[in-house]
């Protein structure tokens, strides 16, 4: 812009400076094709041009090609299912898993399934299987109640938090097996309006001291008319814990119970078979006196 003649000297100097600046300032977007760096006018340090950022450039949209729709019916029809099942990589793991599950179920049903009451015992147990558990109460001189603990301590009973034997009567209701000792007929306590038989208190006290809160093993034979299971019971006691004792035989030796002389419905299991007395008036060899008589006790079923 031409300056008027009345412009001052300072304005003329500013105008000349602007013209010099316009000559030295490069035009935006102008690049040197021969070199990527330019020399500064007042120094020898080359000025490097930064690379062009193309990340913000908008690329044209690409046309996506979708795969054709899958025909499931055709794929199922063409797949060789029989060959896949017969493949050892599929067949062997399947057989191992199935066999393991069936084996665990069988072991649980045969050895680890808890029996709540006597009426739940399968007939396959009679004369073949035994029941292991802890005695929770003694009702009479020849019967008691047992809480079944299948597997014992190896299965976690009495040391795992969820495998405890209940102690309260409410918790034990309908959860114990009523067992009657086989081969003996101890005197009964008063019940159902009947008076107590002689030595019933002594027999009850002895059996309570001998069995209460102890782990026993019962070999079951049958169920009687009162819903109890008749069994030969063994217990281990100190100072000889490795020797198991027949509870019914120990009562006979203590003179606290006679041999059961009923003509029918009597089971003599274990060691009691060889010590059975013949019916009164019959012929037979009596067992040793020390087995059946004691101080103030019974001998040969006489009271």
Curated annotation (Swiss-Prot):
One of its GO terms (molecular function) is metal ion binding. Pfam families: SNase. Ca(2+) binds at residue 185. The chain crosses the membrane at residues 91-107. Residues 129-290 form the TNase-like domain. Residues 1-69, 264-303 are annotated as: Disordered. Its EC number is 3.1.-.-. The active site is at residues 180, 188, 228. GO terms for cellular component: membrane; mitochondrion. It is a single-pass membrane protein. Belongs to the LCL3 family. This is Probable endonuclease LCL3.
């Amino acid at each position: 812009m031409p300056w008027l003649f009345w412009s001052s000297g300072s304005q003329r100097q500013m105008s000349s400076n602007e013209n010099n600046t316009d000559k030295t300032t490069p035009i935006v977007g102008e690049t040197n094709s021969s070199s990527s760096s330019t020399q500064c006018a007042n120094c020898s340090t080359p000025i490097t041009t930064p690379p062009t950022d193309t990340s913000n450039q908008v690329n044209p949209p690409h046309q996506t090609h979708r795969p054709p729709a899958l025909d499931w019916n055709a794929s199922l029809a063409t797949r060789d299912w029989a060959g896949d099942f017969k493949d050892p990589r599929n067949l062997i793991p399947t057989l191992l898993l199935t066999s393991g599950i069936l084996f665990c179920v069988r072991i649980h049903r045969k050895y680890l399934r808890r029996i709540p009451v006597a009426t739940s015992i399968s007939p396959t147990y009679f004369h073949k299987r035994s029941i292991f558990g802890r005695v929770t109460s003694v009702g009479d001189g020849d019967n008691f109640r047992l809480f079944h603990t299948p597997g014992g301590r190896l299965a976690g009973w009495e040391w795992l938090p969820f495998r405890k034997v209940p102690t309260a009567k409410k918790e034990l209701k309908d959860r114990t097996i009523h067992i009657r000792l086989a081969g003996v007929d101890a005197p009964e306590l008063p019940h159902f309006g009947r008076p107590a038989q002689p030595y019933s208190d002594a027999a009850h006290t002895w059996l309570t001291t001998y069995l209460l809160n102890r782990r026993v093993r019962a070999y079951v034979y049958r169920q009687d008319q009162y819903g109890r299971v008749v069994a030969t019971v063994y217990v281990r006691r100190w100072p000889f814990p490795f020797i198991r004792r027949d509870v019914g035989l120990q009562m006979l030796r203590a003179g606290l119970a006679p041999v059961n002389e009923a003509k029918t419905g009597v089971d003599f299991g274990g060691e009691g078979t060889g010590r059975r007395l013949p019916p009164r008036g019959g012929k037979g060899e009596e067992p040793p006196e020390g087995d059946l008589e004691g101080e103030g006790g019974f001998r040969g079923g006489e009271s």
